[in-house]
Every structure is written in C-alpha cells, then in structure tokens.
C-alpha cells in the first residue's frame, strides 16, 4: 500500500483508496486458518464511507497482494468487496488473538473496542 498526498500523485503510481488507512495487521501463520494469508487495513472516515476494516488476500509467501482484477491494476480495484466491517468513526488499532478474533479500537469520544469474528 503506497499512499501519498494528492499533490504528489503525478509523481507516483499510487493506489487511490477511498479511505484513510490508519492501522495494518497481518496475522501470524499459527492463527485461525480463516485469516491465513490476509492483511487487514483499518481506516478512518473517508469521502465515501465511515471508518471500517478491509481484508485483502496475500500470496502464499505473504509478500504481495493476491487481488483478482480484470487488469491486475491496483488503481482500479473494487475495494467494497474486501470490506469486512464498517460504521466505525476511525479504526485506530487492531489486534488478532489465537482464536482468530479481531479486536478493533474505534477512536470515538470516549473510545470503544469491538470484536470481529470469522464467519463459519
């Protein structure tokens, strides 16, 4: 994920995401198989949505995105199909426990912690 300010876009090939990435987590390989080879991006409210969490697949080596796209261009990815949670104000941190549950810290007036569990 390469994010730069809008005034620098002409100098860089960027992934123009519709949100502001704020936290990243890659589960350890010993964690739940549901999240194996995934990267999670927590984000703050953007121009098109409130805050939330995206799950993007990684390749077997866990070093590149494994995103199916007609032209394999990250600039044209439909991010909505990777969203697994939304309606947060701003995801400021995420952690994943041994059971594969994702704990999300939402930066609201007094703060809140939510748990996201894999669908069975």
Which residues does each predicted region cover?
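Residue position within the beta-strands of beta-propeller blades
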Residues: 41, 103-106
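Hydrophobic residues at beta-strand termini and immediately following loops
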Residues: 84
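C-terminal alpha-helix/helix-terminus motif
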Residues: 106, 117-120
């Amino acid at each position: 994920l390469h994010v730069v300010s809008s005034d620098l876009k002409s100098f860089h090939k960027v992934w123009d995401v519709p949100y502001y990435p704020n936290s990243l987590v890659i589960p350890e390989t010993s964690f739940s198989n549901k999240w194996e080879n995934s990267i999670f991006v927590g984000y703050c409210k953007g121009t098109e949505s409130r805050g939330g969490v995206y799950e993007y697949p990684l390749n077997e080596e866990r070093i590149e995105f494994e995103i199916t796209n007609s032209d394999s261009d990250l600039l044209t990815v439909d991010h909505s199909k990777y969203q697994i949670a939304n309606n947060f104000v701003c995801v400021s941190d995420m952690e994943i426990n041994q059971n594969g549950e994702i704990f999300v810290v939402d930066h609201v007036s007094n703060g809140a912690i939510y748990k996201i569990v894999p669908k069975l």
